[in-house]
Amino acid sequence: YVNRFVTFNNFVNSPIARYKDELYNLPFNMNTFSKMWGVATPAEAKAKIEEQIAELNIGEPKNLEEQGLKLVGRDVFEKLIKGYTEKQWGKSCKDLPAFIIKRLPLRFVYDNNYFNDRWQGIAEGGYTKLAEKLLEGVEVRLETDYFPFIAANPGIAGKTVYTGMIDEFYGYKYGELEYRSLRFETERLEEENHQGNAVVNYTEREVPYTRIIEHKHFERASSPVTYVTREYPAAWRRGDEPYYPVNDEKNNALYAKYRALAEGEKD
């Protein structure tokens, strides 16, 4: 369908994780395990993970840290999950609920393809052209606050789909939900190739950003300069962009109260 509007290249996302001075392939696969332990076969990798899990002897996980350790063992969790997760959520893994991680995909094949989709790629030249063509014939209003607009134009549509924050929609009646935000810093570098890959995740807690994106690798562009963007997790405050909600028991209980209100809406 989308190829009717733009041409897609054949980019395949194969991120790299950097922990201190060590580089690992993502998602967790045989290339990751071979670099970490020197193993060569799936059986050796599975045995190493099972050995570490058995040594920890964790019963019912009480928090995300115990859940992660029980799923993948100490090395993978501490090098590739713990610090990155704590940066994302702004909390210690010991203070996050176990249910945030249901499972951690481990692939016992030498394959760095992050996704399993048959068709993968990125719109050549970016997604602006695609968005413009998809929106042809559709009235779009930017820089428009939903609340005063809908108050001044009741019944403007037969059905309204609100995709903003549910607590804001109800005037924070039960209080604010907790969200996480992100901050991006983009920099032009006077070099042809900065990191050799589109995405490099920084998994240690002490590095303030979670990843660096080098944009030219999405389209294999050739130029004497390059642009990189660093992604920093941030606490959310009212007025900031909310990127994702904090998924814990307190927040979920508050969300359930707002959802009950939403279920009573007519349209």
Q: Each PLM stretch: what is its role?
A:
Residues 168-267:
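C-terminal segments that line or cap access tunnels to active or ligand-binding sites in enzymes
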Residues 1-6:
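Glycine-rich FAD cofactor-binding loop and adjacent beta-loop-alpha segment at the N-terminus
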Residues 11-13, 17-159, 163, 167-170:
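Active-site/ligand-binding neighborhood in enzyme catalytic cores
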